[in-house]
């Protein structure tokens, strides 16, 4: 049995890997898979990691890139909340006190909060700060699913809850960041057939239809 150890953030493991792992195991039944979910990044100098998924921009210390998933960042909320709020402008999102923003601690150094999102969209005015904060992005996403407010959504990361209707992408500008979810392997190691198979499987995914989100802003 071939062993494969994969490291990813808690949110990526929870929302992207776990819902889809059955398909990889069906494709590669001979691979014994171990998933390490952690938000504190550590290069694999002192432990055995075959592959990692990290959000940001290269270089990543001790690692090299073998694949990437592009992202769009857009406000998301529960469908019932989207229906109640109706059509919104960016100014509405910034100023209306009945639109509760949800924020979280960063699982990655370049992760955006609301202040960063507004800034990168070119918003120069003030905005209502988030009233609900979580130490985990997974908790922030679940709070949005439960109707507690509006969270920032990374569309590849949240592809499953967006597809199954637990979350709705709001009709607001989508941000196209330079950062990606990168598939990484240790610098001094050649990719094994299992690593190559996992990288292909992860990168293939479901392509994100760019027309699904309006007014994309590249930064």
What would you call each of these model-derived segments?
Residues 5-7, 52, 76, 102, ...:
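Short, well-ordered beta-strand segments
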Residues 10-11, 79-80, 138, 156-157:
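Alpha-helix/helix-capping structural signal
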Residues 34-110, 115-133:
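Acidic, Gly/Pro-rich loop/turn segments at junctions of secondary structure
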Residues 123-170, 176-177, 191:
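Hydrophobic hinge/microswitch elements
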């Amino acid at each position: 049995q071939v062993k494969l150890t994969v490291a990813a953030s808690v949110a990526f493991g929870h929302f992207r890997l776990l819902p889809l792992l059955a398909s990889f195991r069906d494709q590669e039944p001979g691979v014994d898979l171990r998933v390490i979910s952690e938000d504190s990044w550590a290069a694999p100098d002192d432990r055995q990691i075959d592959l990692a998924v990290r959000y940001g921009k290269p270089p990543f210390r001790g690692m090299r890139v073998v694949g990437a998933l592009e992202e769009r960042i857009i406000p998301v909320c529960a469908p019932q909340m989207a229906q109640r709020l109706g059509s919104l402008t960016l100014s509405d999102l910034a100023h209306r006190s009945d639109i509760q923003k949800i924020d979280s601690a960063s699982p990655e150094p370049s992760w955006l909060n609301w202040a960063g999102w507004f800034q990168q969209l070119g918003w120069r005015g003030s905005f209502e700060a988030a009233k609900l904060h979580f130490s985990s992005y997974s908790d922030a996403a679940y709070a949005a699913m439960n109707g507690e407010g509006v969270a920032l959504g990374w569309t590849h990361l949240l592809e499953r809850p967006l597809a199954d209707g637990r979350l709705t992408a709001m009709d607001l500008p989508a941000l196209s960041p330079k950062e990606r979810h990168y598939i990484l392997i240790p610098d001094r190691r050649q990719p094994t057939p299992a690593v190559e198979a996992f990288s292909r499987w992860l990168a293939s995914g479901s392509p994100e239809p760019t027309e699904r989100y309006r007014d994309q802003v590249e930064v």
